[in-house]
Amino acid sequence: MYPFKMNPQEYCKQKTKESHSSFLSAFIFLKKEKKNALIALYAFCREVDDIADECKDNKIGKNKLNWWRSEINRLYNKNPQHPVTIALEPYISKYNLNKLYFIEIIDGMEMDLIFNRYKNFKQLQLYCYRVASTVGILSAHIFGFKDNKTLTYAHNLGIALQLTNIIRDLGEDAKRGRIYVPLDELKKLNISESEILKNIKDKKIKDLVVNQTKRAQYFYKLAINNLSNLDKKNQKPGLIMANIYYVLLSKIIKDRPENILNQKTLLTKYRKLQIALLTFFNYEWIK
């Protein structure tokens, strides 16, 4: 067993606080039990994502991810060793959390170890499904739903959120040698990989960002169109995330998108909380 001294739930809270993520703004209206389940789920995502981000030796990275695959098996055999999985254990059966989604998340992180380019959107969409849609579907189970179409909503929302991350982090990822935008789409705009990696500022970069933003907006709208009125109340935290990221997309387009490789557009904590409150009272950005 890992020699952790911190209480498992406190460990998960600390892990999520370190990330400074927008997800925390979405949790503020949740009851304690659901909030703790979401925090444990997100802490798991942080653990495996940190391996993909920080491990420079792919072999070591794969070994660490394999440890997590084994740990998920131990979790479902009621013998978890890590504080994150110990914190998750009470919620597995309570919220009917499917083991395969956790394995898919790990598989997505392994893609980050193996690939730093994606040939086309089909490849990228698989990556987005594994690292984001799976999390959305698990979250939807925790929030609760009555209509199975809500899982389609969660799937598409995950794609939309991850595409937004990719647009926002285009310059940051380029500095790490990563290009998530499909290469065939760069080629159509006559943008070379080296131009992305060198952080050029150009109108064709603006065109690229506009095109990628339109695709993300499509998936947000596809998600919302699949969310049953029966489930809007329970799925409010996901809607908060959707609105925060949708507003972020709009800000990216307003903030000189041709310069996205040299600047990272962010929303203030106050703005995120404002969006969360407005969403709670049923204000809609995505129509």
Where does each model-flagged region fall?
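Catalytic cores of Mg2+-dependent Asp-rich isoprenoid enzymes
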Residues: 1-162, 167, 171-287
